[in-house]
Regions:
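Glycine/proline-enriched, intrinsically flexible loops and inter-domain linkers
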Residues: 2-89, 97-116, 120-553
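Glycine-rich phosphate-binding loop of nucleotide-binding enzymes
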Residues: 92
């Protein structure tokens, strides 16, 4: 089996580079093919998915991301399949169990073993957010869930196809458990089609260069990345770093939740130890271990080698310690459907631990939360009682850098290449009117020599007779941190007006009526440096564009 520890094999360097890039572009082509064919806006518009190729042991070889937060889950999913199904065939397999190889039930992984002459050479993997997979709330993820059984359909490494064709009984089971069955199955079929593209590209390389040469190239890719990663780590600041923070609450209880990190960096290891963090909580913010590993990998790449390949060799020095039963490694039946709240903190803890050591690479704290929202129901405004759902992240303000203001209205660290859905797509396809999408200049921005970036304000007007709203926003009570005297950011929250009046940070399945208004406000990032040192020209610019939330100094 191919692993990063195998003996380095020398091959023609030109052929090697062609194959290396061929594998990367195969993953990328799979990624774009899925986006083009998908039915749900959360896939084709928001890009909440990822595609990858692993070796036959599940070691990540190449990955294409909409969501960097998936950097640690696809290889875990493959290893989980290998351990559960020793009898793997040339068929597609489907899974979404969070604890062993996932995130939350909405994120459905499909895996295709690449068999050649009876042997498994590689695995082709695709993970996408299905908008609806059952559960207690429309859209499936549930801020008020207290066990995984409330969050949707659990699929434990099931064989999805027979002879490459979706098994009718499995498909009917999936449809029966979805409030939007046509969208759900349409996205599943798009995943399968995109994976066939990647398989075809790999077999084309087999035909052109030879199977053994391609497999040797895989081994060398991982070994080269490992060597590069270790060389860069030697030049990276070493030491032990300690950080603590608090998550607002778990959506069930009001008490803040303590999280902590001890980060140890040596010549050949990058150890993130979350021992001492809270135990798994009653609410759905628990982060499965694969998601926690992803959180650490995201910062490692950003701080150590932003230009590295996303593969097992690059991540070789990383070790994550998260005690079983903790908020960063929950076990069944703890809910995980809004796992991103804790996962984002895992990223932020590592980020905060390193920022003083590598100030030119990392920023002050950002608004952090995915700020995920679901608006769904039955469309009796545009269409004849068809179900609809829009699931999306909400962008906000990033932290200031050592030499510049923070970026405004970007998605959080775990969401990377994802987008908030455009107003045009929403209004064309859903019974919703987007009445505002602007910078958040109403809440005072954080202050510093360099200020944090601004959040945003978005307003949705409900046009159907009824709808439901779910939202999960972190950093509402504990805003983004500043650095070197810079101020904190501002909170994230939502407001509802109309038939109900409400201001909050976490809610599941709130019933709304026609003309109700959902108002989403994300916060600013933290600032860098003493506000007294801010350049006067920058202050005047902020006043001119009304960035200061009404302040005059």
């Amino acid at each position: 089996m191919t692993t990063v520890a195998k003996e380095y094999v020398r091959i023609d360097p030109f052929t090697y580079e062609i194959i290396r890039n061929g594998l990367r572009t195969s993953a990328e082509e799979m990624f774009y093919a899925f986006g083009k064919a998908a039915r749900s806006p959360v896939i084709y518009e928001t890009l909440d998915y990822a595609s990858a190729i692993t070796d036959n042991s599940g070691n990540l070889v190449a990955q294409a991301n909409g969501v960097p937060g998936f950097l640690g889950v696809l290889d875990y999913a493959v290893r989980d399949l290998i351990s559960c199904r020793p009898d793997l065939l040339d068929e597609f397999y489907i899974a979404n169990i969070p604890y062993n190889g996932g995130t939350h039930l909405n994120d459905v992984t499909i895996i295709l073993p690449l068999l050649y002459d009876g042997d498994i050479d590689m695995f082709i993997v695709n993970k996408g957010h299905w908008s609806e997979i059952g559960g207690m709330r429309f859209g499936s993820w549930s801020p008020d869930a207290t066990e995984i059984f409330q969050e949707g359909t659990q699929i434990p490494n099931v064989k999805l196809t027979n002879g490459g064709v979706p098994d009718r009984e499995v498909v009917e089971m999936i449809k029966a458990n979805s409030r939007t069955p046509e969208l759900t199955v349409g996205d599943m079929e798009a995943q399968l089609a995109s994976m066939r593209v990647a398989k075809r590209r790999i077999l084309e390389m087999y035909s052109k260069y030879g199977r053994n040469v391609v497999l040797k190239s895989v081994t060398n890719m991982l070994e080269d990345s490992k060597k590069r990663s270790l060389e860069l780590l030697k030049a990276f600041p070493h030491g032990e770093f300690y950080v603590e923070d608090f998550i607002d609450d778990d959506g069930i209880n009001e008490e803040p939740i303590k999280v902590k990190l001890k980060l140890t960096v040596t010549d050949d290891s990058f150890v993130a130890d979350f021992t001492g963090s809270s135990k798994a909580v009653a609410g759905s913010i628990n982060s499965p271990l694969p998601a926690t590993v992803s959180a650490v990998r995201v910062v490692y790449v950003a701080a150590v080698d932003p230009h590295s390949d996303a593969n097992e060799g690059t991540f070789y020095p990383i070790k994550v310690i998260a005690p079983e039963g903790s908020i960063f490694n929950p076990s069944k039946p703890y809910p995980t459907s809004t796992y991103w709240e804790s996962m984002s903190y895992a990223t932020d803890l590592v980020w905060h631990a390193l920022v003083d050591s590598v100030p030119t690479k990392l920023s002050a704290g950002h608004y952090l939360t995915v700020g995920a929202t679901i608006v769904g129901g039955t469309d009796d405004y545009r269409k004849k009682n068809e179900p609809f759902a829009i699931v999306e992240p909400q962008p906000g303000g990033w932290g200031a850098c050592y030499n510049s203001d923070g970026e405004s209205v970007l998605v959080c660290s775990g969401d990377g290449e994802t987008y908030a859905a455009s107003a045009e797509v929403i209004e064309k396809t859903l019974p919703i009117r987007v009445e505002r999408f602007s910078l958040n200049t109403e809440d005072a921005v954080s202050r510093g020599k360099y200020r944090g970036g601004l959040g945003m304000i978005k307003e949705y007007r409900i046009l159907s007779s009824e709808a439901s709203f779910s939202g999960s926003f972190g950093r509402s009570r504990f805003p983004a941190w500043g650095i070197q005297g810079g101020g904190e950011g501002t909170p994230n929250y939502f407001e509802i007006t109309g038939s109900k009046k409400l201001k909050g940070r976490r809610i599941g399945g709130l019933k709304l009526k026609r003309n109700d208004l959902i108002r989403i406000k994300t916060g600013s990032g933290g600032s860098w440096g003493d506000p007294k040192d801010r350049d006067r020209n920058l202050i005047e610019r902020d006043k001119k564009y009304e960035y200061l939330g009404g302040a005059t100094d």
